[in-house]
Amino acid sequence: MKVIAVTGYKPFELGIFKNDHPGVECIKKALRRKLTAFVEGGLEWVIISGQLGVELWTAEVVFEIQVEYPDLKLAVFTPFLEQEEGWKEDNREYYEFILSQADHVDSITKRKYESPEQFKLKNQIFIEKSDALLAVYDEEKPGSPKYIVEAAKKKGEIENYHSYFILFSDLQDIIEEEQWNNAE
């Protein structure tokens, strides 16, 4: 596997409203574990669309991993131009910082938002251009990642395409592990 697409919930879907929420570090730890294992297995590129939440936290994790594995690259392919236009200023600054550090940035449609079709096209291209999908996703709570996860599963039924998931139970395990380590 050379290229993995990563996605997951937006912050509000997780009840997270600030990047310093303790849940963010837990999610980043889970992402770090998975991505590091994939890098050790030959992963070269991580692709995201730049959504707030799991995708931008993934970018932060990639930047951390690049210290030890400098050949790992991050690409941000936005579904449309200026997706951050309606965001709060602090979120826009955070997003612009991530874009400034990414190895490649491009917009799939090269136009501003016009319709939900741009998201469908983004999902289609992400699945076509990647070897696997990693999603912070639980079928019990579908949310915004539902459509790309469904597209990945369909591709997996006809081709050698894998979907990997970080479930809520995985995050709970990390929380319990942290509590155990802090109790010692």
Curated annotation (Swiss-Prot):
Pfam families: YpsA. Transmembrane segments: none annotated. Gene3D superfamilies: 3.40.50.450. Belongs to the UPF0398 family. NCBIfam families: PRK13660.1. This is UPF0398 protein BA_1582/GBAA_1582/BAS1466. It comes from Bacillus anthracis.
